[in-house]
Amino acid sequence: MLFTSEQVSCGHPDKICDQIADAVLTDCLRHDPESRVAIECLIKDNVIVLAGELTSEHMPDTNALAHEVLRRIGVPEFESYESAAFITRQSRDIARGVDRGGAGDQGMMYGYATDETPELMPLPFMLATRALLALRDLRSSLLLPDAKAQVTYDYEAGRIDTFLISTQHRADVHTVQVKEIVRGIMVQVAEAYGLNIDFRALVNPTGRFVQGGSFADTGVTGRKIIADTYGGMCRHGGGAFSGKDPSKVDRSAAYMARKIARDFVLAGYAKRCEIQLAYAIGMKEPVSVNVNCFGTETVAEKELAQLAQRQYDLTPAGIIKALHLKAVDYNKTAAYGHFGKPQFPWEQ
């Protein structure tokens, strides 16, 4: 069975927007942990637009935060970018339910874990993610921040079938140089996971990738939800994470679902585990909890669903407290995935 997952770099325009939105969120929570934040971002060329709802004792300097994100990513001439903000207070109707400890919206959220990697994450997704992290760490004067990676893994043969990376580069860099650098990263990542290096390697298949970032594509928050999670290996409820404070169950419940799935796999209850939590706006308890172990369970799925409800406080307030979600640096979640990073409480 061939399965493909992708990841995008911190310089991808959609990820630039996610990072700006989470920079605003983190700044608000640092100054006022009770902040209610729902920020969206759009970037095109050198123009940034932020819009959303914000109720906080702190008013963030969105322009300065956006410029700091661009500087950290390594965007050329980041000082020339302009920004505009259209932000109002949170709706009183939404606030009424959240103030009582209820969910900030309806919806279903998924968490997943698998024993196929040390990170308890899908292997092709981790390969794509590790490759882009290595590319980021290696980045020289030859390469620019925008990049994407895609890995096709053959689960029956236990080997990498295809490794694809497209990376932005300077105009004066020869494509042969780019291919040598990127191919070296592919091999390095494959060997780190004890895998074959005789895969099909595709580097910048169009032959040239000079114009990138927001000058090549418009970026918007919430458009890389599969790259944020599990690379397509499990289902997704559709809700994005970045720019949302933890009262939004789109974010907090997805983190708790990951923790439960991870705990169950570590406990030996299953080799693969997908948790679904579903909520109604304004209500504290989930309306349903579902466990799917894809036939790998050692404990009945119904019993695992009951265990999840007994062992974990699944109210929004309980999740926030258990995972310390008002103290998380969300800047570190906004690129290269929200899961499989050991520094976060939902990975512990």
Stretches with model-predicted labels:
Residues 38-56, 281-285:
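Short, charge-patterned binding micro-sites
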Residues 30-31, 265-271:
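Secondary-structure transition/capping motifs at alpha-helix termini
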Residues 4, 45-47, 64-212, 332-335, ...:
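Glycine-rich, mobile lid/loop segments that gate access to catalytic sites or pores
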Residues 19-23, 126, 130, 252-259:
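Short amphipathic alpha-helical face segments that pack within enzyme cores
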Residues 44-45, 270-272, 276-348:
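Internal helix-turn-beta structural module
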Residues 1-38, 43-44, 125:
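N-terminal, positively charged regions that mediate nucleic acid binding
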Residues 172-264:
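Glycine-rich anion/phosphate-binding loop at the beta-strand->alpha-helix junction
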